[in-house]
Every structure is written in C-alpha cells, then in structure tokens.
UniProtKB/Swiss-Prot annotation:
Keywords: Membrane, Transmembrane, Transmembrane helix. It is found in: Membrane. The chain crosses the membrane at residues 233-253. Pfam families: Cyclin (PF08613). It is a single-pass membrane protein. This is Protein CNPPD1. GO terms for cellular component: membrane. It comes from the Eukaryota. The gene is Cnppd1. Signal peptide: none annotated.
C-alpha cells in the first residue's frame, strides 16, 4: 500500500487545521481492512476479535521468530504466553510489527544482547517499548509498567531493568521509517499466507494475491510459465510433425497402391496388323498357294502404305508350333509347276519335303474372323502343313509387297 495514501485526504491534501477532530488518519480504514483480511483478524468488528490482540497465525510466526532470535533455553517463549500478554496488554498489530523491526535491528547491531536474554523477556520488553513509542502519554491505549508486569508475570523492578538494558542495546534509537513498517507488514503477510496454505493444503485467493506480490514468488512463477511455454511449443511441434508424417505416409502408400493397380502402358495393339502382314506365311495346299498369296495381298492393300512401312519392322515373325509328321503320299500336280512347264519330280522349290498333308485342316476364316474367300463353298479346301509354301511364292510375295507399299 502506498504510504502517501494514508497521510492525504480525499482531495490530496493534508492540513493540520482541526487535526484534533480526526479520530483516525485518512486511509486508516484501508489499512485496517488489509490487516484484517491478510493477517486473519476477522471481518466482523462486533463478534470477531478486534485489532487489540494478536491473531493465531500472527502469534505462531511471532513465537517462531523470537525463539530463533533468542535461543536461550531459560523461559522459552510459548504461544499461550503470547496470547495471554497480547490480550491483557491490548497489543495492536502495528505495535507487534514495530517490535519485530526492533528485534531485527538488534540482530545486526548487538547480537550479544540476544544471547543473554530469554525469548519471553524479549517479547515482553519489545512489545512494551513499541507500544510506548506509538502511544504517547495521555492516550487511551497507554499502559503503565505495572500493568505490563502484571500481564507478563514479572515484577516492576525487573521490568524496569529489562527496559533499560533493551534501550541501551538499541542505543536509544527507536525512530522507524514508515517504509520499514510496510516492509515488515508485507513480509508478515507472505509468511502467514504460506504457513496457512501449507497447513490447510490449499490456498485462498487472498493468499495467492499476497504470494504473487512477493518478488521471489514472481520470479518462480515467471520461470514456471517460461518452462510451460517451452514445453507447449515442443509438444505442438511434435504433434504437427507427427501429423505431417502420417499424412505423407498415407499419400505415399496411396500413390504406390494406385501405380501398382493401374495397368502399365505398352505398345499399341498390333495383333490385327501383324496378322494381316504375316498372313502370306500361313501354310496352304500346293494347288492353292498362289490363291492364298493373292487373297492376303488384297487384304493388306487396304492398309496405308505408311503404316505398313512403320509396323513391318516392329512385327516379330510368328513361329507356328510344329505339327506331327504326316505320312508320305504321292505327289499331285502343282498348278505352279504346270504354269512354268515343269514336271513335278523336278520341282524342288515347291516340293522340298516330298510330302503333303492329306488330312483336313481348320479353315483360316474361322481362326481370323474373316469371310470365306470361296464363293462357291463355305468350307475352304484343306491347307498344307507349315513350311510347305514354296520359296518362289515367298519371293513373289515380297516383290508384290514392295511394289504396293514402297519404302
């Protein structure tokens, strides 16, 4: 809380005129509300405990702090003693915080004094000096030494000696900057919030607000937030990478399956063209050799000369399967031999094997899907077996093909 807010009025000015009429300073209600809320003094002014005695969390912290400051085992301070003295002497939280400031000064300036005094005497004398400093003579909160001695169970002479030794150890320097009071208040609030949160197992919103105001907690929370952000970024990168990898794997697998299922592109269907080009080599009977050659040439004339010149080198020669040997039969007269005036025994070009087929063979148009070449008979005459076409007819076929399809 800003200190200037406590010393200024609503208009931002503080005047000494009529100061006696003010019961409290401007901003005192805010400070009282802060102490009640953060130091567990309660909210109800009528039923709950007032600010004239210490709350239970503040009493616990006071006992712990004074036991560490004065480690003497004689008259070791207990919480019951703190509660009794604070209730009988009406110790306010401001007086308690001022007493903590004095004890902190003694730890740095005169630590030998703390080694010889008991923690109970240190608590009693520090609270008495702080109350006398805050509440001057004539105030309602004024408490005399005999009343302090009765509250603490100490004789007045002993209490006076303790007061003189305490003031000597302090070198009579009791003035305190209000900023030191607010520093002690902030430290006390954080200790109370942390202690109560650990005791309950959970923290209230007020405790969290108090802890987040501390620089140590702010650094710890900032470091935690940075680590969480880094972890979130790493998890996000890992998630995106895994998703991208999964998508890429699915795409690759889909593409590979598509390529394997699709037929591979090949050369165009040349079966019909190759069949028409190589049809002259189909075996035929000797008497009909030239007739088959002429019919094949008439079927191939319909194709363009360009396609014939391009597809002829690409078409592999067909090799018909070998047939079983036929029994030798007497030779018949070959029309080709009669045309060239040759005798059948002397015609070696047509009758190389000296045998002809006597069994009927399958008609060509049934295998090729063509119409029968003979108009007078639906069934073709029997063909010769493979390798029965004469060399002369093959040569004339090549000559006719070169004339029809040049190049």
């Amino acid at each position: 809380m800003d200190l200037t807010g406590l010393l200024l009025d609503e208009e931002g000015a503080f005047s000494l005129t009529g100061f006696q009429d003010f019961m409290v300073l401007p901003g005192h209600q805010k400070l009282s509300a802060r102490i009640r809320r953060r130091l567990y003094y309660g909210w109800d002014l009528e039923t709950d405990c007032s600010l004239e005695e210490l709350s239970s969390p503040v009493a616990d912290i006071t006992v712990e702090l004074l036991q560490k400051a004065a480690p003497s085992p004689i008259r070791r301070l207990q919480k019951k003693y703190v509660a009794h003295v604070s209730r009988e002497a009406c110790i306010s939280p401001c007086a308690m915080m001022l007493a903590l400031v004095y004890i902190e000064r003694l730890r740095h300036r005169n630590p030998d004094y703390l080694q010889h005094v008991s923690s109970s005497d240190l608590f009693l004398i520090s609270m008495m000096v702080a109350s006398k400093y805050l509440y001057d003579e004539g105030e309602e909160e004024e408490v005399f030494n005999d009343e302090w001695g009765a509250a603490g169970g100490v004789a007045v002479a002993t209490l006076n000696a303790l007061e003189r030794s305490f003031l000597s150890a302090m070198d009579w320097r009791l003035y305190t900057d209000p900023r030191e009071i607010f520093e002690v208040l902030s430290w006390l609030e954080s200790c109370v919030a942390e202690q109560q949160g650990r005791r309950r197992g959970w923290y209230t919103y007020t405790d969290l607000c108090v802890l987040l105001e501390q620089p140590t907690w702010q650094l710890a929370l900032g470091s935690l937030c940075q680590r969480l952000v880094k972890l979130s970024c790493l998890l996000a990168v890992a998630y995106v990478s895994s998703v991208a990898l999964a998508v890429a794997s699915v795409a690759v697998i889909h593409q590979s399956l598509g390529l394997s299922s699709s037929p591979s592109p090949g050369p165009p269907e040349l079966t019909l063209v190759s069949k028409s080009l190589v049809q002259p080599c189909v075996p035929a009977p000797v008497s009909q050799c030239l007739t088959n050659v002429s019919s094949c040439l008439e079927g191939s004339v319909d194709l363009p000369s360009l396609w014939g010149s391009l597809l002829a080198p690409l078409t592999p020669p067909l090799r018909p399967p070998p047939d079983p040997p036929a029994p030798p039969t007497p030779l018949h007269k070959c029309p080709l031999c009669q045309k060239f005036q040759r005798l059948p025994p002397n015609c070696r070009a047509c009758h190389t094997n000296q045998t002809v087929s006597i069994g009927p063979s399958r008609p060509l148009y049934h295998a090729r899907g063509l119409a029968p070449p003979w108009l007078w008979s639906p069934v073709a005459p029997p063909f010769l077996q493979p390798q029965q076409c004469s060399l002369f007819s093959v040569m004339e076929l090549a000559h006719l093909k070169s004339v029809i399809s040049p190049g």
